[in-house]
């Protein structure tokens, strides 16, 4: 859900918001400054893309977050807002998949590569680029149907391995994959589980991910625009068939990509609130 906080005259405001594991909360704040603090994250408030007098903060809720209440505090010079965050669980589905056994129980010679790739990805996602490259709404990288939703618990060859950290989009034959928005290509290489992989840094803690690609149309360091063709879809890595896996990382936390871009895109819809309020959309 998107929480819009309009603040005037008061120096403190208390409200509540409900969030869900694996989803993000988008906060629109009364000033483009300050810090949003949770029990495990300190998030810089960012400039609103269409209103210079407001700020935004994107709070990802970890897939494995526990249910219950926690406090979020926004602090800026002379102002503060306390938000009671109520975390609820999403009932994600279970998927049973059959894949190459080597992608479930990797051979010993692959383990070093897998660990190296995980460490590299962690370092990428935890890096905060203090620049925003995008100034418009985000788009899906393919105009096709979803074949596997975000968050499903996945059993590979009878063994529960993980949850699905993105969405799968239908791509029966190699077709062009488009950048969801502007940014810098940070990674473009083959990886053990995700196959042909591209990661784009959109700035300010946002990274989009594209997996199982068959061909790259960009290289590391390239600046891409929304809609640019960055690759062709494929069937590389741990897959059951050809498709595109699309994911998003926010401040180092994996989040539902379509939920995230839907919420960010509301920032480009004019708002007309002109009173002191806390409104939940």
Where are these regions (language model features)?
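Sec-dependent signal peptide recognition
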Residues: 1-7
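Short, well-structured beta-strand-loop connectors
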Residues: 176-186, 218-233
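Zn2+-dependent peptidoglycan hydrolase active-site motif and core
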Residues: 180-217, 242-244
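Cationic-aromatic interfacial patches
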Residues: 15-93
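Surface-exposed, glycine-biased beta-strand/turn segments
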Residues: 84-194
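N-terminal signal peptide c-region/cleavage motif recognized by signal peptidases
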Residues: 11-13
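Acidic, glycine-rich catalytic/binding loops that coordinate metals and/or anionic ligands
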Residues: 92-120, 134, 219-226, 247-281
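Short, charged beta-turn/beta-strand-edge "cap" motif at the junction between a beta-strand
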Residues: 191, 230-238
């Amino acid at each position: 859900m998107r929480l819009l906080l309009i603040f005037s005259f008061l120096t403190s405001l208390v409200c509540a918001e409900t969030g869900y594991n694996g989803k993000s909360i988008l906060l629109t704040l009364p000033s483009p400054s300050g810090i949003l603090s949770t029990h495990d994250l300190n998030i810089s408030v960012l400039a609103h893309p269409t209103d210079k007098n407001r700020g935004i903060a994107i709070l990802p809720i970890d897939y494995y977050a526990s249910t219950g209440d926690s406090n979020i505090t926004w602090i800026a010079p002379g102002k503060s807002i306390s938000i009671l965050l109520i975390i609820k669980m999403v009932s994600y589905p279970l998927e049973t998949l059959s894949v190459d056994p080597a992608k479930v129980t990797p051979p010993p010679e692959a383990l070093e590569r897998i660990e190296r790739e995980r460490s590299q990805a962690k370092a990428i996602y935890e890096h905060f680029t203090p620049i925003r490259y995008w100034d418009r709404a985000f788009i899906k990288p393919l105009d096709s149907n979803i074949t596997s939703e975000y968050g499903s618990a996945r059993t590979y060859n009878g063994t529960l391995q993980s949850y699905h950290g993105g969405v799968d989009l239908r791509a029966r034959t190699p077709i062009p994959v488009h950048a969801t928005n502007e940014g810098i290509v940070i990674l473009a290489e083959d990886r053990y589980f995700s196959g042909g992989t591209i990661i784009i840094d959109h700035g300010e803690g946002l990274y989009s991910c594209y997996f199982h690609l068959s061909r790259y149309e960009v290289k590391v360091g390239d600046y891409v625009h929304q809609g640019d063709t960055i690759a062709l879809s494929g069937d590389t890595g741990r897959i059951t068939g050809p498709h595109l896996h699309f994911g998003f990382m926010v401040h180092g936390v994996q989040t539902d990509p379509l939920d995230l871009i839907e919420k960010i895109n509301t920032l480009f819809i004019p708002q007309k609130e002109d009173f002191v309020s806390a409104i939940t959309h």
